[in-house]
Curated annotation (Swiss-Prot):
It holds the Pfam family Rhodanese. It is an enzyme of class 2 (transferase). One of its GO terms (molecular function) is thiosulfate-cyanide sulfurtransferase activity. It catalyses: thiosulfate + hydrogen cyanide = thiocyanate + sulfite + 2 H(+); thiosulfate + [thioredoxin]-dithiol = [thioredoxin]-disulfide + hydrogen sulfide + sulfite + 2 H(+). Residues 17-105 form the Rhodanese domain. The active site is at C65 (cysteine persulfide intermediate). Gene3D superfamilies: Rhodanese-like domain (3.40.250.10). This is Thiosulfate sulfurtransferase GlpE. GO terms for cellular component: cytoplasm. It comes from Tolumonas auensis (strain DSM 9187 / NBRC 110442 / TA 4). NCBIfam families: PRK00162.1.
Length: 106
């Protein structure tokens, strides 16, 4: 079984420049709707079936939560169901928003 890799927000930003990389944001709906990285997939228990249908097991998946803790559990789960390249972003959205652009609603 493969394992996920913990990466920095800088490494995540670099990976997101590559084609066919998925950013999965696992924060709660109100936080996600208020602000998120443009193009992020909002991964929840409800959207998991859609995620597994749309995102192939070979697609690199970057998992983002608030600070980089909860994302590790989800990253571990994704590897356990066969995703081959899974990354947990240390610092999460809180780290990202201080350095990189994101979409916010007023």
């Amino acid at each position: 079984m493969s394992q996920f890799t913990r990466i920095s927000i800088q490494q995540a930003a670099a990976l997101l420049q590559l084609p066919s990389v998925c950013l999965a944001d696992i924060r709660d709906p109100s936080s996600f709707n208020a602000a998120h990285v443009t193009g992020a997939f909002h991964l929840t228990n409800d959207t998991l079936p859609q995620f597994t249908q749309q995102i192939t097991k070979e697609t690199p998946v970057l998992v983002m939560c608030y600070h980089g803790n909860s994302s590790q559990g989800v990253a571990n789960y994704l590897t356990s169901i066969g995703y081959e390249k899974v990354y947990s972003i240390d610092g999460g959205f809180e780290g990202w928003r201080h350095v990189y652009p994101y979409t916010a609603t007023v």
